[in-house]
A protein has these predicted regions:
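A short LG(V/I)-centered, amphipathic sequence patch enriched
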Residues: 1-12
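Short amphipathic alpha-helical coupling segments at ligand-binding clamshell hinges
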Residues: 13, 17-20, 62, 177-178, ...
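Alpha-helical linker/hinge and terminal dimerization helices associated
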Residues: 17-39, 270-273
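Central regulatory/effector-binding core of bacterial HTH transcription factors
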Residues: 43-106, 195
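A late-sequence structural motif
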Residues: 58, 216-218, 228-273
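Short beta-strand-centered segments that line the small-molecule binding cleft or hinge
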Residues: 62-65, 83-139, 209, 229-231
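Hydrophobic hinge/microswitch elements
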Residues: 81-85, 90-94, 100, 171-227
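Secondary-structure junction motif
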Residues: 128-130, 135-185, 252-254, 260, ...
Length: 275
């Protein structure tokens, strides 16, 4: 205060202090309003990622449901191969990814999304099918999960060892599992092409260019093709889980929580962090 003035007035420093205090209060109120909107999902952003298969067929209905429920949250979808997805998840560029590859449990939290099974897909024109009639499955059988029935027989891969195969390249979960399956079966296959995407191998099988190993997720998501015959594989590596991943010790935003709850209904009943 300036005691020499009449009436008593604030000094310039005092006036500056009051103005600064008012600005701080305004910022606090603005931040509280922003946090309130974040908690109510009236604002914010969420970045999710997956391989081409999951980005094309698994994420869209979840994203559509989320956007309808929370239209003010900006949701980004990134598509890429597993190493790139993990790189972006680690860097914080993605909040959540979906993948069937087991990531480092010391770095990432995971929640089980679904189970999928590997199948042998063979062009119907291949002669080897004649030796395996009782093991054959159609796409409609896969869609009603007949291959998951313990009483349905699995085929011996040796029946197809002389056929051409299209295969995924190394450093891929499907390829690693197939290598383990073939190793246990004691057979080597004739790989005519090596590719990067599971869907690409499937499409080449559709064109009769080679047999392939595909997930039942692919068969369930795509239109039925009578030119492909499917076979059940009896091996532990033929069954795998698909997970939602996010970085360990990362703050779980309300948008992340709600997205995970929509993707995995009922998860909040088993974990308090999603309540």
């Amino acid at each position: 205060m300036d005691g020499t003035a009449s009436p008593i007035q604030l000094t310039e420093c005092g006036k500056k202090y009051i103005k600064t205090a008012e600005k701080i209060m305004d910022l606090e109120n603005e931040f509280a309003y922003y946090v309130g909107n974040l908690q109510e999902l009236k604002t914010g952003r969420l970045s999710v990622g997956g391989t081409y298969l999951f980005s094309s067929f698994i994420f869209p209905p979840i994203i559509d449901k989320f956007r309808r429920a929370y239209p003010h949250v900006k949701l980004n979808l990134f598509e890429g191969h597993t190493p790139l997805l993990e790189q972006k998840l680690f860097a914080g560029e993605l909040d959540i990814i979906i993948d069937n590859y087991l990531l480092d449990a010391g770095i990432y939290e995971k929640e089980r999304f679904m189970e999928e099974r590997l199948l042998l897909a063979v062009p119907s024109s291949f002669d080897s099918n004649r030796r395996a009639v009782k093991y054959q499955l159609k796409a409609s059988d896969i869609k009603r999960c007949l291959h998951q029935n313990d009483t349905f027989p699995a085929v011996s891969l040796k029946k197809f060892k002389d056929e051409p195969f299209v295969m995924l390249r190394s450093h891929n979960d499907t390829r690693e599992r197939v290598d383990a399956i073939l190793g246990r079966a004691g057979i080597q296959l004739n790989y005519t092409l090596k590719l990067n995407q599971l869907l690409t191998t499937y499409h080449l099988t559709e064109y009769g260019m080679g047999a392939s190993f595909v997930s039942d997720t692919v068969v369930k998501c795509l239109p039925e093709n009578p030119d492909i015959i499917y076979y059940k594989i009896d091996d532990p590596e033929a069954v795998r889980d698909v997970y939602l991943y996010y970085k360990k010790n990362k703050y779980l935003t309300r948008s992340m929580i709600e997205f995970i709850k929509m993707a995995i209904p009922g998860i909040e009943k088993n974990s308090e962090k999603y309540v």
